[in-house]
Amino acid sequence: MAHRILTLILLFCSAHASASLFGQQNASQFVPADQAFAFDFQQQQHQLTLNWQIKPGYYLYRQQIRVTPANASVAPPALPTGEPHEDEFFGKSEIYRDALSVPVTVEQAAPGATLSVTYQGCAEAGFCYPPETRTVPLSAVEPTESVKANAATPSAATGEQTRVNSDSPSATLPFSAFWALLIGIGVAFTPCVLPMYPLISGIVLGGDKRLSTRRALLLAFIYVQGMALTYTALGLVVAAAGLQFQAALQSPWVLVTLSAVFVLLALSMFGLFTLQLPASLQTRLTLMSNRQRGGSPGGVFAMGAIAGLICSPCTTAPLSAILLYIAQSGNLWLGGGTLYLYALGMGLPLILVTVFGNRLLPKSGPWMEQVKTAFGFVILALPVFLLERVLGEPWGVRLWSVLGVAFFGWAFVTSLNATRSWMRAVQIVLLGAAMICARPLQDWVFGAPVAESQAHLAFTRIATVDDLDRALAQAKGKPVMLDLYADWCVACKEFEKYTFSAPEVQRALDGAVLLQADVTANSAADVALLKRLNVLGLPTIIFFDAQGNEIPNGRVTGFMDAPAFATHLHNRLR
């Protein structure tokens, strides 16, 4: 009797272990989204606080948090800096663990107003949840004074979705304002600007070369500040205009138009045509400048301010490009600061010439035209950045490749005129850089390497519950595998790249009907399908037998490598 009881216990333990090993291996370890990311909120008058308690082993994506007010106006929330996170498919991002509190200022809320909060997260084990949306009822709040003052300018967060992260246009622009300083210094060495510095220096000093070094430095600095004032004002005006038309400036047709303008500005730097103010206006501004008295702080400052309005053919294109660039940001600080640093960069060589004389200036020559051409390539980087938003990442990579090949190819050809021996090493570097930049174009024209063009499973796409029922009915006695996929699911992409492409997996699935549902949009049909299948998150792969019934303990949640998945298939489909 004791022997039989012991045998039954061993059989039970063996069956339990087998189910744990080959069955629904990950389904029990993942909790519903409400438990993984417990959401709560509190409102006190104008201050609303959104709280998340994040279960250990789970995290929220910073860039996936959005708020959408209805019958209310809220200030754009500022999320705290998250923990750096990187994966193969989505690159660098920021995540939150443990707990998160986000303060939101409610500027105005009518009775019955609500705030929809959308968020998304994953488990560290490679399991991602669909975007979750919670509706927060808002207590009625009277408009603040700032809202009343700006009633003519609706808040960006009024009645439209606001993504509360650093993905605003100002944050995603490719260059920081510091680059404007370097661009200004570079423009100073173009053929239209550099030869003018000795003349401008003499005008600033009022023809008196007996001034002390301190006095000369002061006058030169004042002149540069006058020029910087004009440029800063231009930056503020353009950034403010960009702020008023922020949404329009992000539409595809505007981005394409701006890109075309940037290309024209670059062509002017290549010498195809001359771009400058009308001669009559330049003459009038020059006469105004000549009436100022050099050698005096007030007169020098006025000359600098007027000089900021007189654009030479070499400065018009870079200045126009920077102005259009900061209009994309709608950021007043960025607009004013960028143009100030640009003017400061142009003024630094003038300060050196005024204080130390012409001996610090390099000799004029063809190299100045090459500097001007190089800035044409810098301007061409801006349309590539803008078009990348419209055309998508693959075409963006190809455009960057074309620009890189063009720049390094031009630099290589230009360097062939050099006679110094050390330039041979530079030529090798330039040629190598051009070849590296050409790689995306080679892959596009001649096809990706064979190793990357692996055969993938031929899925039949379904979108609704009815599609699933029809596909199961038409399976004709074959087993069915349903793969639930979404673009925001990292492990789904890992399945696609590493598991489904493996020969042993494809052999194990031979004879099975392969279905796939893309639930990226999280639409009503997607939600209904996930609810019907009782799916918490992705990746989830479900197996059905020849009668259309789900195979017990066959469901896979979380990533599986090819050998483990092939073993699972043999145990469930055979």
From Swiss-Prot:
Signal peptide residues on this chain, from the entry's feature table: 1-19
Keywords: Cell inner membrane, Cell membrane, Cytochrome c-type biogenesis, Disulfide bond, Electron transport, Membrane, NAD, Oxidoreductase, Redox-active center, Signal, Transmembrane, Transmembrane helix, Transport
GO MF term set: electron transfer activity; protein-disulfide reductase [NAD(P)H] activity
Main location, first listed in the record: membrane
S-S bridge residues: C122-C128, C192-C314, C489-C492
Stretches that traverse the bilayer: 173-193, 218-238, 253-273, 306-326, 333-353, 367-387, 399-419
Enzyme class: oxidoreductase
Annotated segments matching region Disordered: 147-169
EC number(s) per entry: 1.8.1.8
Protein's membrane topology: Multi-pass membrane protein
Localisation per UniProt entry: Cell inner membrane
GO biological process: cell redox homeostasis; cytochrome complex assembly
Domain of life: Bacteria
One of the record's GO cellular component terms: plasma membrane
Catalytic activity as recorded in UniProt: [protein]-dithiol + NAD(+) = [protein]-disulfide + NADH + H(+); [protein]-dithiol + NADP(+) = [protein]-disulfide + NADPH + H(+)
Record-annotated Thioredoxin domain positions: 430-574
Family to which the UniProt record says this protein belongs: Belongs to the thioredoxin family. DsbD subfamily.
Described function: Required to facilitate the formation of correct disulfide bonds in some periplasmic proteins and for the assembly of the periplasmic c-type cytochromes. Acts by transferring electrons from cytoplasmic thioredoxin to the periplasm. This transfer involves a cascade of disulfide bond formation and reduction steps.
Name this protein carries in UniProt: Thiol:disulfide interchange protein DsbD
Originating species: Cronobacter sakazakii (strain ATCC BAA-894)
